[in-house]
Amino acid sequence: MNIESIRDYCLSLPLVTEDFPFDETTLAFRIMGKIFAMTDLENIDWFVLKCDPERALDLRDKYSEITGAWHMNKKYWNQINTHGMLTDDFIKSLIRHSYSEVVKKLPKKVGKESPSILSING
C-alpha cells in the first residue's frame, strides 16, 4: 500500500483531519484533534499507528514489517513498513484499529454528538 492510498484511506474515515504538527514533513492524521496515524513525507517507506499494547506486541512478533515506533511510546505505537508483505486489507484493518483506539479515549459525549465515529471497528 503506497502513501497516497494510506492517506486516502485515513481521510475516508469519519471526521479525520490532517496536518503537520511538528515540521513540514511529518504528516499526522487526527480524529477530534487526537493523532492516530503519522508518516514522514521524506521517508514514505513507513508510517506509525496507535495500537492496543497487547496487540502491538503480538503484531511485532508475527510480522517483521511491524516494529515499535521510533520516537514514540513503543507501548502504544507501531511502525509499519509499507514495502513488506502486508496486504492492503490488513493495513486498512490496522488503520481502523488505530482510529478505534483513539475514539475509545474520547469523551462519551463526542460519540453521542458524532455517532459516525463509533461505526468504525478495528
Residue ranges of each PLM-predicted region?
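Charge-dense, helix-prone N-terminal extensions
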Residues: M1-G122
